[in-house]
Amino acid sequence: YLPRVGVPTMFILAIYILTFTVGFPANVFTFVTLLGKARRRVSSSDILLLNLTAADLLLLLFLPFKMVEAAAGMTWPLPVALCPVANFCFYSSIYLSSLFLAALSVERYLGVVFPLQYKNRRRPGRVMAASVVLWLLACSHCSIVFISQYHGGRNQTAANRSTANGSDASACYDDFSRDQLSFVLPLRLELFLVLFLLPFTVTIFCYTNFVRALLARPNIPLEKKQRAVGLAVATMINFGVCFAPYNISHVVGFVKKQSPDWRVYVLLLTSLNAALDPVIFYFSSTAVQRAM
């Protein structure tokens, strides 16, 4: 439970504003740069980076809704219909980011460890098709926000009422009933397993072997090795800081049969991903480096 007014909500609002201020221009800049390069000659990594940037922009475009929610003391002063839409886009972008970060690690791993085989089989069309599958995977899983609020025969947003500044205001996607929790918590555990743990495991394996293979080759320039290490470190920090705490809350909630009180704070960390991803873009794309 969060106080409806006071330091915690203002802290959340400040983090959202900082994330938007830093992340939005950086991601727009990166998207335009990558799109310009892709128009001349598209590569597999460019396609994946464009999708990762698009996922970040999706989060950032709906972040103002979360700002309004925080400014209103964690209540929802906007039309009720916008609540599931805003949360669907917000949560989808989180898992899209983890999936495309994992896809980038696979692309880097195959290109270094199996260069000849991968070069012969690498096709932009295949990467585009895989990207569509990842979008469908994340969005289909996160569509539970449209179902869970009405599970049990009541509209959660309309039903949860709290008092803020002396007037009634609704809470958005919060304070689930027992019936709703019995529906939501197992699905959250699946999100942890399929959309976080699996991509994270793949990413660790790929970048560990990617960096090891590069460092073992004396003919690779030192600058390229440093970029590889920087890319791996930035990605691991992103997973560890932005995604891991929030997804661990899924496991804790499933075990305890209720959402942990600190869940709202670790959800806050996921938004920082949109501000940290440009660091990954810098290490991943020479076009972005030249543009900067």
Language model region names:
Residues 1-3, 70-95, 114, 120-131, ...:
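Loop architecture of class A 7-transmembrane GPCRs
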Residues 5-17, 40-104, 111-121:
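Extracellular TM2-ECL1-early TM3 structural module of rhodopsin-like
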Residues 7-37, 58, 64, 201-207:
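First transmembrane helix
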Residues 14, 18-21, 51-54, 64, ...:
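Hydrophobic residues within alpha-helical transmembrane segments
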Residues 31, 35-47, 108-130, 166, ...:
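Intracellular signaling interfaces of 7-transmembrane GPCRs
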Residues 54, 160-184, 189-196, 208-248:
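Intracellular effector-coupling site of seven-transmembrane GPCRs
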Residues 61-64, 140-147, 197-205, 235-252, ...:
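Hydrophobic alpha-helical segments of membrane proteins
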Residues 241-250, 265-292:
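Seventh transmembrane helix
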